[in-house]
């Protein structure tokens, strides 16, 4: 049986917040930050819900090194 995603709760909170606020991301920054904190606690690849943040981070690093 697969393990439960350690950051699933925070991901669900983001969905609830977005639905409650007409998908205005700016109103959900606090819950988004909570998910980022959760993702930072686990090794890369451990949480499926964190994969978007991991990809974003990789792209930012690629852009920074390309601009040097």
From Swiss-Prot:
A motif (Cx9C motif 1) lies at residues 7-17. Keywords: Chromosomal rearrangement, Disulfide bond, Mitochondrion, Proto-oncogene. SUPFAM superfamilies: Cysteine alpha-hairpin motif. Disulfide bonds join 7-38, 17-28, 39-50. Its main location: mitochondrion. The keyword Disulfide bond applies. GO terms for cellular component: mitochondrial intermembrane space; mitochondrion. Expressed in many tissues with a relatively high level in skeletal muscle. It is found in: Mitochondrion. Pfam families: CMC4. Residues 4-46 form the CHCH domain. A motif (Cx9C motif 2) lies at residues 28-38. The keyword Mitochondrion applies. Belongs to the CMC4 family. The twin Cx9C motifs are involved in the recognition by the mitochondrial disulfide relay system. It is linked to Overexpressed in T-cell leukemia bearing a t(X;14) translocation. This is Cx9C motif-containing protein 4. It comes from Homo sapiens. The lineage of its organism: Eukaryota, Metazoa, Chordata, Craniata, Vertebrata.
